[in-house]
Amino acid sequence: MMPRLQQHKIILRQLGLQPYAPVSQAMHNFTEFRTDTTPDEIWLVEHQHVFTQGQAGKAEHVLMPGDIPVIQSDRGGQVTYHGPGQQVMYVMVDLKRAKIGVRQLVTAIENTVIETLAHFNIDSHARPDAPGVYVEQQKICSLGLRIRRGCSFHGLALNIAMDLEPFQRINPCGYAGMQMTQVSALQPGVTVADVQPVLVREFTRQLGYPTAKLQPWSLSDYLLSSHSSSSVL
């Protein structure tokens, strides 16, 4: 666990089911305009069907997207899939203020997922050669971050109770033949709503925050500047 950040609060936003592009732009705007005193935030969201290509993404890993759009992202990593039943958690953390490095944050996120899955009696692990969290050889959680001005954004995508078929249309995270799994395949009946509070509790514990404070989320709050628009999300 990291040194306690009791002097810093963290805000939780529940976004529900949202398209990828406007949420990504809102996250960029938040990061661009935050100050040294802006509280860190966690955003919980399920995205409508989308493939996102990370900065290292290669076109050959998108095999047959079909009717699912492919959007370029500036997060780390390669291509992945988002859809309903998958919990995406975006983590906007001021690393300078927290006095932690990127590797420490990645480890904290991976440990957050490992401990969350343990709560549901699922054994999982991280891999030194491939970011994310795995159950045996199957991937259950993808991870991709970007750091701007010492602050993180993007985050994790945990498969919970979703249609995994679209993963067969890509090489997930750039690995041909990578098999995906999800919480409900290992513990039938577990839902996104079951996992959310455990995931938030474990993340705040890993980084030593006090309890996250739930506040409403509105897209209009993040439409801050006309020059913050970008084609890379």
From Swiss-Prot:
Binding site for substrate: 75-82, 142-144, 155-157
Site feature Lowers pKa of active site Cys, where: 139
One of the GO biological process terms: protein modification process
An example molecular function term from Gene Ontology annotations: lipoyl(octanoyl) transferase activity
Biological pathway: Protein modification; protein lipoylation via endogenous pathway; protein N(6)-(lipoyl)lysine from octanoyl-[acyl-carrier-protein]: step 1/2
Residues at the active site: 173 (acyl-thioester intermediate)
EC number: 2.3.1.181
Coiled coil: none
Family matches, as SUPFAM superfamilies: Class II aaRS and biotin synthetases (SSF55681)
Catalytic activity: octanoyl-[ACP] + L-lysyl-[protein] = N(6)-octanoyl-L-lysyl-[protein] + holo-[ACP] + H(+)
Top EC class for this record: transferase
GO CC annotations on file: cytoplasm
Predominant localisation class: cytoplasm
Pfam family, one: LplA-B_cat
UniProt keyword list: Acyltransferase, Cytoplasm, Transferase
Domain named BPL/LPL catalytic: residues: 36-211
Entries under Gene3D superfamilies matching the protein: Bira Bifunctional Protein, Domain 2
Cell compartment(s), UniProt: Cytoplasm
Function: Catalyzes the transfer of endogenously produced octanoic acid from octanoyl-acyl-carrier-protein onto the lipoyl domains of lipoate-dependent enzymes. Lipoyl-ACP can also act as a substrate although octanoyl-ACP is likely to be the physiological substrate.
Family according to the record: Belongs to the LipB family.
NCBIfam families the UniProt entry points to: lipB (TIGR00214), PRK14342.1 (NF010922)
Note: In the reaction, the free carboxyl group of octanoic acid is attached via an amide linkage to the epsilon-amino group of a specific lysine residue of lipoyl domains of lipoate-dependent enzymes.
Descriptive protein name: Octanoyltransferase
Organism: Yersinia pestis
Source species taxonomy: Bacteria, Pseudomonadati, Pseudomonadota, Gammaproteobacteria, Enterobacterales
